[in-house]
């Protein structure tokens, strides 16, 4: 299952058949192959890819040995992609073609501590008719004797965002190899400049 590491550049639109298509621009690769996992040695097939060059002074000794063994320059990011055994020593954006479908994984924007209305779309309490200081409250979180407790997983206020999110089955609209750019239809998780992993989709289009 082929894949590549990239950085979300931002969103724009392109025109296709006189219609505007919203696309996310991803700067993908080139990613050097740092390590290969094999069923004989590791019990599974995978490839470890690197992305974004790193200052050698900021690399610790174990990683320096890891990069030297692979014969690659130090990189800032290392990620494994399972069931992928690419040819050659570098993975580029050319592994994808327009019209293919991909899954994009990233870290959603962190929004800090959020209440139930923002975090879970609760309606909140009434604004008037005697309502006092409950306008944005969740309401009851558990009855008296039954159940007499708060269920695990109850939707309440708390930390919102900054989670690993995968958006599936996005269409590759265009590939620009000379600039290492990948254009996918729709939105992908995370802020501009955030790390994303683009993989061949697990879900075929219906």
Curated annotation (Swiss-Prot):
Keywords noted in UniProt = Ribonucleoprotein, Ribosomal protein, RNA-binding, rRNA-binding
One BP term from GO: translation
**Disulfide bond as UniProt keyword:** no
Q: Which domain of life is it from?
A: Bacteria
What GO MF annotations does this protein's record show?
Answer: rRNA binding; structural constituent of ribosome
Cited InterPro entries: Ribosomal_uL3, Ribosomal_uL3_bac/org-type, Ribosomal_uL3_CS, Transl_B-barrel_sf
Question: Which GO CC annotations does the UniProt entry carry?
Answer: cytosolic large ribosomal subunit
The record's subunit annotation is: Part of the 50S ribosomal subunit. Forms a cluster with proteins L14 and L19.
Question: What function does this protein fulfil?
Answer: One of the primary rRNA binding proteins, it binds directly near the 3'-end of the 23S rRNA, where it nucleates assembly of the 50S subunit.
Family membership = Belongs to the universal ribosomal protein uL3 family.
Protein's name in the database: Large ribosomal subunit protein uL3
């Amino acid at each position: 299952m082929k894949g590549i590491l990239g950085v979300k550049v931002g969103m724009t639109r392109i025109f296709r058949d006189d219609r505007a298509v919203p696309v996310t621009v991803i700067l993908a690769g080139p990613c050097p192959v740092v390590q290969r996992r094999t069923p004989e040695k590791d019990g599974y097939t995978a490839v470890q890819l690197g992305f974004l060059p790193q200052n050698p002074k900021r690399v610790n000794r174990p990683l320096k040995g890891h990069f030297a063994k692979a014969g690659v320059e130090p990189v800032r990011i290392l990620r494994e992609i399972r069931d992928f055994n690419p040819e050659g020593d570098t993975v580029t954006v050319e592994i994808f073609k327009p019209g293919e479908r991909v899954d994009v994984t990233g870290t959603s924007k962190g929004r800090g501590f959020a209440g139930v209305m923002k975090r879970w779309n609760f309606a909140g309490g009434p604004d008037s008719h005697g309502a006092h200081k409950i306008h944005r409250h969740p309401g009851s979180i558990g009855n008296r004797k039954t159940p007499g407790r708060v269920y695990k997983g109850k939707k309440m206020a708390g930390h919102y965002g900054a989670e690993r999110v995968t958006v599936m089955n996005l269409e590759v609209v265009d590939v620009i190899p000379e600039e290492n750019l990948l254009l996918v239809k729709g939105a992908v998780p995370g802020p501009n400049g955030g790390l994303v992993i683009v993989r061949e989709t697990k879900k075929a289009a219906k």
